[in-house]
Structures are given as C-alpha cells and as structure tokens.
Design a protein with these regions (language model features):
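Short, low-complexity disordered leader/linker segments with a strong preference
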Residues: 1-28
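Extracytoplasmic "Venus flytrap"
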Residues: 18, 31-51, 55, 68-75, ...
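Signal peptide-proximal N-terminal region
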Residues: 53-66, 177-178
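Short, well-structured alpha-helical segments in soluble
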Residues: 74-90
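Periplasmic-binding protein-like
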Residues: 88-97, 116-118
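Flexible loop/hinge segments that line or gate small-molecule binding clefts
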Residues: 108-132
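Hydrophobic alpha-helical segments within soluble ligand-binding/sensing domains
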Residues: 130-152
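Phosphate/pyrophosphate-binding betaalpha-module
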Residues: 151-178
Length: 178
C-alpha cells in the first residue's frame, strides 16, 4: 500500500500581503486603486483597471474593489489615500509614481494600512513598491532598433522622471549594440 502524501496548501499572494487571523479570516477584503487619470484616457490606468476587473471576476464576493480617478499628484493624492483609509480599505494600490510621497506619508501616519505604490526603490518598512521589469522589453526594443536603424542615431522619449527610466534607456542602448 502506498502512503498518501498530502501537499501543504499553497498560500496565495494576498495571504502574504494581508495575513489574517481570528474573526478577520472570513472578512471580505476591500482593495482600492487610485488613478492619476481615467482608464478611458490613460493606457497606464487602463492596464491597472484591467487588473482591478480581473480581481472582481476571479474573487467575486470575497474581495470588494473600489477606484478613485483623476487624482492630481501633490494636490489631492494625500486626501484620496485618506479617504480609502477612512473607508477601511485593506489594501491600497496607488498607481502613479508621482504620488509616492503622499503614499509614504500616509503609510507612516497609518502603519496598519497596506499601501503599495507603483514606483521603484523606496525602502521603508511601512510601504511597498511594485513595477514591471521594463528594462527587459527595452533591451529587446533596442535590438530591433539596432537592426532597423539606418544610422547610429535612435531616439527615446521618457515617460516620467523616475529611477527606472535610466535603466530603460541603458537597456535600449545595450540592445542596440552602440
């Protein structure tokens, strides 16, 4: 007779971000998204909105999602985050790197709040950041640009002044091979 081996239950990403115990274990999670623009006018916001909709479709009644659009950095970002905190939002995605300082201020002021900002290289115990490894795609784009370019000159339009932009430019140039 072969013994039956039982695999331990796999934890999903939410269990790492939002450990729960006791009466909280059955509580419906509330996840908020803060957008600088609207999903209709910004591809960046639209991509995050697709993620929000995927959460709704996948988790159904287990997770409630909300979003706030047209939040201006350095003007009403702090208050938008505060509104979600006041509404007992468990996890807040601030989708603009331009709102990092408001995110960090709120994370420090409300250490129990789980705030993630879409940006790079902020190391602080109260906030987490996330961002795609865009340099990999930029490297491949550089390879294509290098093959197609008729001269040694190519252009790059940077989206915003953040740490990762220079890594993207460097990857593009490495890929181009010049």
């Amino acid at each position: 007779m072969d013994p039956v081996t039982t695999q331990p239950a796999k934890k999903n990403i939410l269990s790492y971000l939002l450990p729960r115990s006791g009466g909280e274990a059955n509580k419906r999670l509330k996840v908020g998204f803060i957008y600088e623009n609207t999903p209709q006018t910004s591809e960046w916001c639209y991509a995050h909105e697709l993620g929000r909709q995927y959460i709704d479709e996948t988790f159904g009644s287990q997770i409630e999602t909300v979003s706030i659009t047209n939040v201006r950095p350095k003007e009403d970002d702090y208050n938008a985050i505060q509104r979600l905190i006041d509404d007992n939002t468990d996890l807040i995605f601030v989708t603009s790197p331009s709102m990092m300082y408001a995110s960090l201020k709120q994370a420090i002021a409300h250490p129990k709040a789980k705030i993630l900002n879409c940006s790079l290289n902020i190391s602080h115990k109260y906030i987490r950041t996330y961002y795609a490894r865009m340099y990999e795609a930029k490297y491949l784009t550089g390879v294509i640009a290098g093959v197609m370019a008729k001269s040694d000159k190519i252009g790059y339009v940077a989206s915003c002044p953040l740490y990762g932009v220079m890594a993207n430019v460097n990857a593009l140039l490495w890929g181009q091979g010049r």
